[in-house]
Amino acid sequence: MPKASEIKKGFAIESNGKTLLVKDIEVTTPGGRGGAKIYKMRCTDLNTGARVDERYKSDDVVETVEMNKRAVVYSYADGDEHIFMDNEDYSQYTFKHNEVEDELLFINEDTQGIHLILINGSAVGIELPSSVELVIEETDPSIKGASASARTKPARFASGLVIQVPEYIATGDRVIINTTERKYMSRA
């Protein structure tokens, strides 16, 4: 069984008799020498859908749950539900908006590399690729000669995602975004 420091976003863990899907991990180091890092994991209870926070020290052993991944593409939205289609057998998987709302910020019809997470044969979540390519919907006008400065400005995408981009980026530019850190990487 892995230690808490080896757990990543998207892992399924077992805690207090509950099966949890790790949505986000926050690492803090308490003051003082030799203080072990504390991993605060924001999870979703796969049975109830409730959000659960778990805390572990870096050397705590965490019980993981075996899971399978299948390549899928975003198909369409139907009211409050979002449908993903399996790339191999074309079966469809439906998620409520609140179950995948964080992931939807990085997804459009062209997004490749999305994986469906299956535990005991049932779909429990989706995993994003490490980076995605999106088109900027709205940002302040670009400033000529600003490429040498490290100043940034907010940029909004069609999905509602807002991140900081360099000043020389303009509306309509295709950019590559790191999905785990929610940061601009480069122009596409």
From Swiss-Prot:
CDD domains: S1_EF-P_repeat_1, S1_EF-P_repeat_2. The lineage of its organism: Bacteria, Pseudomonadati, Pseudomonadota, Gammaproteobacteria, Vibrionales. SUPFAM superfamilies: Nucleic acid-binding proteins, Translation proteins SH3-like domain. Belongs to the elongation factor P family. Signal peptide: none annotated. GO terms for molecular function: translation elongation factor activity. One of its GO terms (cellular component) is cytoplasm. SMART domains: EFP (SM01185), Elong-fact-P_C (SM00841). InterPro entries: Elong-fact-P_C (IPR015365), NA-bd_OB-fold (IPR012340), Rib_uL2_dom2 (IPR014722), Transl_elong_fac_P/YeiP (IPR020599), Transl_elong_KOW-like (IPR013185), Transl_elong_p-like_YeiP (IPR011897), Transl_elong_P/YeiP_cen (IPR001059), Transl_elong_P/YeiP_CS (IPR013852). GO terms for biological process: peptide biosynthetic process. PANTHER family: ELONGATION FACTOR P (PTHR30053), TRANSLATION ELONGATION FACTOR KOW-LIKE DOMAIN-CONTAINING PROTEIN (PTHR30053:SF14). This is Elongation factor P-like protein.
